[in-house]
């Protein structure tokens, strides 16, 4: 089982509240098969037996924030 923690920080938003962007990023991974995730205050825990699925979920989350008009996104990913 592969576990990863991803923390996404939208930069240069019109508001200091990033919850809208984070919620949309999490929504983007809800239908990825063979992926389990858990939300906590510091990020989102991703779990899968396949590293490609972890990568797909991470990419989806980051691209979702970009598609919402945020050009700069700071991302921290820890993988175990």
Model-predicted segments: where are they?
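Charge-rich, low-complexity N-terminal segments
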Residues: 1-80
């Amino acid at each position: 089982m592969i576990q990863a923690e991803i923390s996404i920080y939208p930069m240069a938003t019109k508001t200091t509240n990033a919850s809208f962007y984070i919620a949309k990023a999490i929504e983007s991974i809800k239908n990825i098969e063979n992926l389990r995730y858990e939300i906590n205050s510091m990020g989102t825990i991703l779990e899968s037996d396949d590293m490609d699925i972890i990568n797909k979920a991470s990419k989806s989350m980051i691209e979702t924030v970009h598609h919402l008009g945020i050009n700069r996104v700071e991302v921290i990913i820890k993988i175990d």
